Amino acid sequence: MEDYREMQNFYQSKYNENDRMDRNPLEYLRCKEIISRYLDDKVMKIADIGGATGAFSFWLAQQGHIVRLLDYTPLHIDQAKEKSASIGIELRSYDCGDAKHLPYESGEFDLVLLMGPLYHMQKEEDRLQCLREAYRVLKNNGIIICECISRYANIFEGFKNNLMNDEKFVEILDENLAFGMHNPQDTGYFTTAFFHTVELLKSEIKQAKFSFIDLVSIEGFAQALDTDRWLSDEGKKETLLKYIRKTERIPELLGISGHHMIIGKK
């Protein structure tokens, strides 16, 4: 599909995904913290679908879990293999493929991560197919954890980064808010994407037959802050994280967060 070729080209030749989590330390910290709530002491079989260059895959493998990484962009898989060789941590497999058609056996995994696919699929039928594939490859009682972009994320990006004088950005933002569609046109902004509302996220998980477990904000109210000074000091960082945790489920605050995480069970 044209949309996914555009997305693949963005990651293949325009954007360095390999150090994205270094550039977004609060998002990375919070994602690991939330994922950790669903990890067992026993060795788990985990599929990191759309896992890019393996930021979460290698973190999980380092803890002793068996991890298969899949991503749509060939460069990401090549970079993951290079990283594996440099840090001495092996994943079970490195697969270049489509999240809607997984190359795995039914009932293979204890945990499936979808930390990117749902926010790159603009068509609901594609998102549901992706979720149904995750359902298929999970064991009974297996857990799915999905990261999605908030419908309102670009409001904060626009005002924090002085983009509101850019007419094209404003056009993109207005489409985000009205329909959830993010189309970069001929700009250098983020690639083709879909921005969820909280209720739509819950609906799609349930349509794919998952039992809903939880939905939390990732950055929470900190999305509206310049967090560098809070994260550079250990004491301030712990204070920030403490209050993000305290407010991560408050309905009135969910829309502020740049990203949400939804958890379901097979």
Predicted feature residues:
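A short glycine-rich, Lys/Arg-flanked "PGG" loop and its adjoining helix->strand segment in the class I
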Residues: L128-N140
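Class I SAM-dependent methyltransferase SAM/SAH-binding core
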Residues: A55-H101
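A short acidic, Gly/Pro-enriched loop at the edge of an enzyme's catalytic core
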Residues: K100-V112
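Conserved class I S-adenosyl-L-methionine
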Residues: M1-G50, A55, W59, I143-E175
